[in-house]
Amino acid sequence: MINKDTQLCMSLSGRPSNFGTTFHNYLYDKLGLNFIYKAFTTQDIEHAIKGVRALGIRGCAVSMPFKETCMPFLDEIHPSAQAIESVNTIVNDNGFLRAYNTDYIAIVKLIEKYHLNKNAKVIVHGSGGMAKAVVAAFKNSGFEKLKIYARNVKTGQYLAALYGYAYINSLENQQADILVNVTSIGMKGGKEEMDLAFPKAFIDNASVAFDVVAMPVETPFIRYAQARGKQTISGAAVIVLQAVEQFELYTHQRPSDELIAEAAAFARTKF
């Protein structure tokens, strides 16, 4: 029951998603925590952040287009956010606002969890959205043989130069052990919902398929790779792990793997 001691966590986004709201509130309820999570939209990020501070809002998830523009209004930037100059999580400790990027944290942890070979050749397809978090995570995890393939030449070249990698505008004569999709290809409801993020022959010659598209849980890219016995890491794993990292920052509690899976399954029905 909501009362005077209930701690509020929130999200600020141009287009709020139900996933985070449902996921966090499910865990609060199951763990008996006096928290509530609510999504908000805003056009004024400066005053929204001032509101977070002034009203004692415990935590705030930040989505596009505010991940970079919110940074001047925060007190401390964690290395996870410094690594990509982008924030997706704010923690309010008695008026002191600390900023993190749990997307970056999640990808680093998934690289470690799946024991990805640092000597492997990697191709990242895409240069927008999650691309910076993905590329920085691979860079700071010790991967040197990474190339960025993007349809947008300008942003692809910029991202490659930013982290000291090569940009390629074609997959012809290329080969990689780890394939990472950071485009919207395969996304539910998108124009390319049924498409593969990489050519079939390319996937056949790879060892790992990594997709950041969260819905559906299994994109065509992931399904094709699984059918051929490849190691796969789904966007669903990314979105859940980054949300868990947020939850722990807000509450100082880490739910069990079973409860996390339960909350994620429930949240997907509301996505």
Swiss-Prot record:
Family statement: Belongs to the shikimate dehydrogenase-like family.
Active site, per annotation: 67 (proton donor/acceptor)
Name listed for the protein in its UniProt record: Shikimate dehydrogenase-like protein HI_0607
Gene Ontology process terms (BP): chorismate biosynthetic process; shikimate metabolic process
One Pfam family of this chain: Shikimate_dh_N
InterPro entries assigned to the protein according to its UniProt record, in alphabetical order: Aminoacid_DH-like_N_sf, NAD(P)-bd_dom_sf, Shikimate_DH-bd_N, Shikimate_DH_fam
Binding site for NADP(+): 126-130, 154, 184
pH relationship of activity: Optimum pH is 8.8.
Keyword list, A-Z: NADP, Oxidoreductase
